[in-house]
Amino acid sequence: MMDLNADLGEGFGNWTLTDDDALLACVTSANVACGFHAGDASVMRRVCDAAAAGGVRIGAQVSYRDLAGFGRRSMDVPPAELTAEIAYQIGALRVFAEAAGATVSYVKPHGALYNRVVWDDDQAAAVVAGVRLAGGAPAVLGLPGSRLLAHAAEAGLPAVQEAFADRAYTPQGTLVPRGEPGAVVHDPDDVVRRSVGMAVERAVTGADGSRIPVAARSLCVHGDTPGAAALARRVRAALEEAGVEVRAFA
């Protein structure tokens, strides 16, 4: 079984970035921007309505408060402040999810925060504290071996491991930083091959050519990648052709 997720609702006002409706037709989980790196109330409500109508699970994609940098700038936010900001974002999205007859099934950090909580124990703990403060028991989605997932498990929350179809990996199993050459995999055929390999063989070829074990229950295709919807459709079709059941983890 493999979940297929994508980042959605990454626009605000009249500005749009992702083809939300097209992506919702082929993913099983939607990482919805909660207003801190992208998204606004109207966008969040529209995406939640569409996701609920299509049976797609809704996840809160929480971020540093960084609209100008699209959440891709690492920030030294005090833990108590970060906890409050995480709870705030989840709470805002939950209003629209519940109004649509659904719920916030999981929480996934975005951008720089996602990478920071792989190794930063204080920020990882603060994010999990924010999830608990918001209430309920949503799953927490993150990189295998991250401090985030360790803290989530310790808090009794479902800790779900994620892999990336269109990102390069270091030999240590972390993501190659976006500023480095080759960090994003642009060749659609390569993305499809890597996706099937991670789902079936549970491994991926790293940036140095080494084989890296991958134990993931969810696979991400970035919604802001050019042609993201068409790529997501190809990935899903290839997974199903390989005998992989594509369904939500939550």
Curated annotation (Swiss-Prot):
GO biological process terms held by the UniProt record: carbohydrate metabolic process
One term of GO molecular function: 5-oxoprolinase (ATP-hydrolyzing) activity
Reactions catalysed: 5-oxo-L-proline + ATP + 2 H2O = L-glutamate + ADP + phosphate + H(+)
Keyword Hydrolase belongs to the record: yes
InterPro entries, per database record: Glyco_hydro/deAcase_b/a-brl (IPR011330), LamB/YcsF/PxpA-like (IPR005501)
Top-level taxon in the UniProt lineage: Bacteria
EC number: 3.5.2.9
EC supergroup of this enzyme: hydrolase
Pfam family, one: LamB_YcsF
CDD domains: LamB_YcsF_like (cd10787)
Keyword entries, A-Z: ATP-binding, Hydrolase, Nucleotide-binding
NCBIfam families: PRK05406.1-3, PRK05406.1-5
Family that this chain belongs to: Belongs to the LamB/PxpA family.
Record text on subunit structure and interactions: Forms a complex composed of PxpA, PxpB and PxpC.
Role of this protein: Catalyzes the cleavage of 5-oxoproline to form L-glutamate coupled to the hydrolysis of ATP to ADP and inorganic phosphate.
UniProt name for this protein: 5-oxoprolinase subunit A
UniProt source species: Streptomyces griseus subsp. griseus (strain JCM 4626 / CBS 651.72 / NBRC 13350 / KCC S-0626 / ISP 5235)
Gene that this polypeptide is encoded by: pxpA
